[in-house]
Amino acid sequence: MASLRKTHPLIKIANDALVDLPTPSNISAWWNFGSLLGLCLITQILTGLFLAMHYTSDISTAFSSVTHICRDVNYGWLIRNVHANGASFFFICIYMHIARGLYYGSYLYKETWNIGVVLLLLVMMTAFVGYVLPWGQMSFWGATVITNLLSAVPYMGDMLVQWIWGGFSVDNATLTRFFAFHFLLPFVIAAATIIHLLFLHETGSNNPIGLNSDADKVSFHPYFSYKDLLGFVIMLLALTLLALFSPNLLGDPENFTPANPLVTPPHIKPEWYFLFAYAILRSIPNKLGGVLALLFSILVLMVVPLLHTSKQRGLTFRPITQFLFWTLVADMIILTWIGGMPVEHPFIIIGQIASVLYFALFLIFMPLAGWLENKALKWAC
């Protein structure tokens, strides 16, 4: 008689995704980040749920309620620190996951990749509205600056901004709706994640050499379930260390001051994981141009599959494109640094060069390198 996990309608779904899933035997630790993102999402939903039990989304009490959570709620300080730093780990994992996809050509699974880009946008949106909730100075001014960007939309920009604000400035209505969105979006992300996995399991996983692995597959459990478990332990250890030893390392000191619409902080900047996009936004002097550049800095990922010119899938055997990939990584680091710097010489020009290079690598250099490597292969033969 067949076992229950193979016959029960519900358990069968979990079995096909987590136990009997045929997995390429040679996938490396770079394939761990998908499951780590799942762990991050679950951690964020659970800690967020407990925070929501004590938080009040009213401008007169929001800041005090966060203080109350940290001082009076049992382990409230821990829940808040894990939630705040968990967001950073979420983005570390998501950027590593995307980098893996770019390096090994996983983007050729177009549906999976495009839903992944939508997931990235949803996570960014969730993190942005979440950052506003403590109602500190950087929360308030960050919300003001970023929502104000929508005023660059032709004809309906100002109306759009006021509609999002729920008034003529970032106020109580804004905070209330941002809390509602911040509560709702993680569940939308969870649903999109299931669709992401559904499309992935239609094709099966890619692997480091980019070749068809049908001839060499192993079951997901126990081989990769234990490998994922090791990843969980390492990430949870790192998150715990950060949350317990230096919980405010990645935050902005400005956010310890309650929001004051009459005092502008000297440097308004988002959390570290948005700095690269913020640098691209600031590198264009025109408001609408900057907003479009900001949007395309993420949406450019959607055109990557269309610009794949190489006969090989990954970069494992493609040294020229490898060099360009690591140039992109260095460029992202430079953009992140520039995003946190004041708008003055020499940071302006460095940011502009880095922004041009960012788009050039995706749209020009990488497709060209793929074409060149095809030619080199022909000559070598």
From Swiss-Prot:
Cofactor requirements of the protein: heme b
Matches recorded under InterPro entries: Cyt_b/b6_C, Cyt_b/b6_C_sf, Cyt_b/b6_N, Cytb/b6-like_sf, Cytochrome_b, Cytochrome_b_C_euk/bac, Cytochrome_b_N_euk/bac, Di-haem_cyt_TM
Domain of life (superkingdom): Eukaryota
Binding site for heme b b562: H83, H182
Family to which the UniProt record says this protein belongs: Belongs to the cytochrome b family.
Note: Heme 1 (or BL or b562) is low-potential and absorbs at about 562 nm, and heme 2 (or BH or b566) is high-potential and absorbs at about 566 nm.
Name of the protein in its database record: Cytochrome b
Organism: Cyprinus carpio
